[in-house]
Amino acid sequence: MIKIVFSNLLFMFAFLPANIILYFLARNFKVKNIILIIFSLVFYSWGEPVFVALLIFSSFIGYIFAMQIHKSETEQQKKMYLIISLIINIGLLGIFKYTGFFVNNLNALLPIDLPVPNISLPIGISFYTFQIVSYVADVYCNRVKAQESFPKFLMYVS
């Protein structure tokens, strides 16, 4: 499988031009946004297609909890939604980035021999996780209004 990066010839001379051409041929912003979302998700799927579901799931969690924070009337409710969102999104990041490290250290510290899982790292997981976390925190702190459109939020994240 070809790895696609920004400096890859396939990206520069096929993927990017197709994205730009379709974007500028689109007549309205809704269609333009859909084109950008599709191309972003295709780009993310190039490494491992199954991880696009993780990106969409993480985005959906951020979107739902930001909306709940925005609609909540009490500070206690807002804080609860913020914490749940952080636990889920940072928890997913931790599972993918640090499970092997954690198991290796347990094996070194304790007289056990746990199998070290071979977990692939999703492309951009740190970037989009912190993008989501910062957005939800900004909604919590009233720095930004919660985005009411999931496609617009997904475009922001991806």
What is each of the regions a protein language model found here?
Residues 1-158:
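Membrane-embedded transmembrane alpha-helical bundles that form the catalytic cores
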